[in-house]
């Protein structure tokens, strides 16, 4: 589970991490702006991405936008089940999406994990991906979901869209975990529960949330050799 991130910010760096400085409140996520000369811009011990406390915050992911603002995603246990929350920070470190952040989805699945954030600068699009634990025909599985945010608005509905796709009769035989995200290219690890193999798949998705022209609906298997 990644506990820290660093992303480029102008000529400087944004450091994002989780720590337990308040042991009775669980892990919390903090950030700091680090200048090229080694100086810092914010409080000496960093600034929290949310004022929510008392439940673990983990697995931070972030991307810097063209206006030097930052979109972050993390796993937050404040609700009954671990779910992903979002925050938008301006170039001065101010919280733009409220002091407590906003939930990634309106629905509350059993679990969300593996958040990833990427920015497509030429279209001013923020892409987010994650693993969603849900019931399919009475069986619980992880599948990969995605969301695109543009002009502060979710473009793929309140709960995003399912990225990892299989024919109806095959859904039960696969489980997927989000791996990497680069702009609108989603990469995940697929576990075949019948063959007991694991493979890496990649899929390009257009701005409407549809599989990009020329790409298979189920994604492109990067290698035919199991991992």
For each predicted feature, which ranges?
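Extracellular, repeat-based ectodomains that mediate carbohydrate processing or recognition
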Residues: 1-227
């Amino acid at each position: 589970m990644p506990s820290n991130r660093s992303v480029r910010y102008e000529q400087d760096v944004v450091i994002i991490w989780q720590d337990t400085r308040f042991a009775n409140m669980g892990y919390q996520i903090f950030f700091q702006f680090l200048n090229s000369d080694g100086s810092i811009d914010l409080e000496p011990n960093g600034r929290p991405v949310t004022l929510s406390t008392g439940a673990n915050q983990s697995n931070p992911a972030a991307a810097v936008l063209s206006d030097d603002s930052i979109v972050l995603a993390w796993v937050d246990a404040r609700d009954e089940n671990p779910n992903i929350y979002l925050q938008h920070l301006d170039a001065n470190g101010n919280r733009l999406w409220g002091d407590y952040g906003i939930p990634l989805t309106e629905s509350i699945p059993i679990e969300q994990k593996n958040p990833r954030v990427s920015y497509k600068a030429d279209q001013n699009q923020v892409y987010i991906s994650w693993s969603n634990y849900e019931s399919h025909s009475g069986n619980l599985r992880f599948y990969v979901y995605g969301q695109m945010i543009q002009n502060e608005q979710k473009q793929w509905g309140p709960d995003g869209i399912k990225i990892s796709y299989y024919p109806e009769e095959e859904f039960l035989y696969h489980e997927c975990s989000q791996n990497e995200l680069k702009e609108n290219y989603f990469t995940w690890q697929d576990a075949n529960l019948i063959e007991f193999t694991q493979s890496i798949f990649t899929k390009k998705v257009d701005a409407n949330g549809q599989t990009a022209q020329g790409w298979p609906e189920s994604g492109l298997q990067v290698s035919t050799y199991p991992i």
